[in-house]
Regions:
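Catalytic cores of nucleic-acid ligases and guanylyltransferases
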Residues: 1-346
């Protein structure tokens, strides 16, 4: 039985990198794939060690104090030690998860920790096992846990039909995973994601003054890194609450600088007048319809700040064509009918 690697320093994260999904244009088919709902929240790695709990962000920052209810629930699991991978998200009354609601304590949404993988349990390196076995053990571990921890269920095969159903229900998209593979840190072909609407993180490089009755800011000027150069991606002027407009202004004014960080500097015809450049340290998530031919966002809408992402890591996401991300060129047929996408099973 493989054992989990010992660490010389207790403050070190239990693994060097999380497994990440590659964006694709089409969900894979075939019984070798299982499909899960894509949650709209913060990726969190939960580490349990003899009753003590540590919650780590995607970049392994200690976020235990951010989600005390999650930490308490993890501490009550029936294991001496465990490492769980999942996503903390706010669940709306209609069952969908909302990143905006997660950032707004007054949204009325309830907080849940959706767990979809088990990396270690009682000293055993479960991450070396096939995903299907890991999920079976995970479900056993959390089935009697407090309601804040929720098991992320899945369906087998029929990925495209499952994706279409997810989009009809207003979900962000789906994650498809090879059921026979171990947990492989980094971004690779055994986990792929298909999105109903394009969304990605973008760096805030400036803002414009508000007009009319609007307060705070008018719009955000955003971009992404291409090598060491920050490329302009567009102007985001929708998706803000009044409180968020004021919060953004308070964050951006201290970051103002004389020169644009964008290369090349966008013309005023693209940004509008009354623009202010800022040091590009803040990252936001933006939903949009498509990329235009000149590399700008079409119909963008702001979704929220991403304090779990570094600006320098933000690049333009380009989906791979089906068949180039570990998907089979000739999908294997499956007799199993797709289940409706459920948020979770307790």
């Amino acid at each position: 039985m493989a054992r989990f690697t010992a660490r010389t320093n207790a403050d070190e994260p239990p693994i060097t990198e999380l497994q990440l999904a590659t964006l694709v244009t089409e969900a894979p088919e075939g019984i070798e794939w299982l499909h899960e709902q894509k949650f709209d929240g913060y990726r969190i790695l939960a580490e349990l060690d003899r009753g003590k709990v540590r919650l780590l962000s995607r970049r392994f920052k200690d976020w235990t104090s951010e989600f005390p209810a999650v930490a308490e629930a993890v501490s009550k699991l029936s294991a001496e030690s465990a490492v769980l991978d999942g996503e903390v998200a706010a669940v709306m009354p209609d069952g969908r998860t909302s990143f905006q609601a997660l950032q707004n304590a007054r949204s009325g949404a309830r907080l849940s920790y959706f767990v979809f993988d088990l990396l270690e349990m009682d000293g055993e390196a479960v991450m070396k096992l096939a995903l299907e076995e890991r999920k079976a053990r995970l479900e056993q571990l959390v089935r009697k846990s407090p309601g804040v921890i929720r098991y992320s269920d899945h369906v087998l095969g029929s990925g495209r039909e499952f994706f279409q159903l997810a989009c009809k229900q207003g979900l962000e998209g789906i994650i498809s995973k090879r059921r026979d593979k171990p947990y492989l840190p980094g971004r690779g072909p055994t986990w792929v994601k298909t999105k109903c609407m394009l969304r990605q993180e973008l760096v805030i490089g400036g803002y414009t003054d508000p007009e009319g009755s609007r307060t705070g800011i008018g719009a955000l000027l955003v971009g992404y890194y291409e090598g060491s150069e920050l490329r302009y991606a567009g102007k985001v002027g929708t998706g803000f609450s009044h409180a968020l407009l004021e919060e953004l202004r308070a964050l951006l004014v201290p970051l103002e600088c004389a020169a644009s960080a964008f290369s090349p500097e966008p013309p005023r015809a693209w940004t509008g007048s009354g623009r202010h450049w800022v040091t590009p340290t803040l990252v936001g998530e933006v939903a949009f319809a498509e990329w235009t031919n000149d590399g700008r966002l079409r119909h963008p809408s702001f979704q929220g700040l991403r304090k779990d992402k570094r600006a320098i890591d933000v690049v333009r996401e380009t989906p791979e064509q089906a068949g180039t991300s570990g998907t089979s060129a000739k999908p294997k047929p499956t007799k199993q009918k797709p289940a409706k996408p459920r948020a979770t099973r307790r």
